Amino acid sequence: MRLFLWNAVLTLFVTSLIGALIPEPEVKIEVLQKPFICHRKTKGGDLMLVHYEGYLEKDGSLFHSTHKHNNGQPIWFTLGILEALKGWDQGLKGMCVGEKRKLIIPPALGYGKEGKGKIPPESTLIFNIDLLEIRNGPRSHESFQEMDLNDDWKLSKDEVKAYLKKEFEKHGAVVNESHHDALVEDIFDKEDEDKDGFISAREFTYKHDEL
């Protein structure tokens, strides 16, 4: 019995030691351009309007560009909720409008073992990202009262979806129903702690503070 316990403890120790020796994957960030004045820096839950170019590190080939492949239009996305790549959520925090960053994203924070489209499995990716605008996102504390249309101190899926549509339309972005539905479901999956179909003010604020 003692031998069994000793082996179990030893196995746990070795496993923990190996885990500690293996570094967590990180995004390499290079600031290419920065404004002289920065009134606001990005944080989790913010809506970001960006232009970007994505390249494969192995051969430098371009796999996507908003300038070329998106009718020349920048894109909106919400930071910190895995709406984009994990590498974006990690590498675009604390960014200012007018700032341009180069991100080198390892496979674990990109498309991993599966790859996607023109991107082979286990690809390291390079992105040049230009931040054009920051807005309060659907998960920001400041937006709660604006989203709570009936003032009942809780948010329904319809209220969150209506807010998203209004924000996207305000800035000339194309309203994509399936995109909004998926984003709302993701928000409720993370925010609706008691799974009652609503996000209370307490749930909203508590989750936002963790971002």
Swiss-Prot record:
It catalyses: [protein]-peptidylproline (omega=180) = [protein]-peptidylproline (omega=0). Residues 135-170, 179-211 form the EF-hand domain. The keyword Transmembrane helix does not apply. Disulfide bonds join C38-C96. It comes from the Eukaryota. Residues 1-19 form the signal peptide. Its EC number is 5.2.1.8. Inhibited by tacrolimus/FK506. GO terms for cellular component: endoplasmic reticulum lumen. Its main location: endoplasmic reticulum. GO terms for molecular function: calcium ion binding; peptidyl-prolyl cis-trans isomerase activity. A motif (Prevents secretion from ER) lies at residues 208-211. Glycans are attached at N176. Gene3D superfamilies: 3.10.50.40, EF-hand. It is linked to Ehlers-Danlos syndrome, kyphoscoliotic type, 2: A form of Ehlers-Danlos syndrome, a group of connective tissue disorders characterized by skin hyperextensibility, articular hypermobility, and tissue fragility. EDSKSCL2 is an autosomal recessive form characterized by severe generalized hypotonia at birth, myopathy, early-onset progressive kyphoscoliosis, joint hypermobility without contractures, hyperelastic skin with follicular hyperkeratosis, easy bruising, and occasional abnormal scarring, sensorineural hearing impairment, and normal pyridinoline excretion in urine. This is Peptidyl-prolyl cis-trans isomerase FKBP14. It comes from Homo sapiens. The gene is FKBP14.
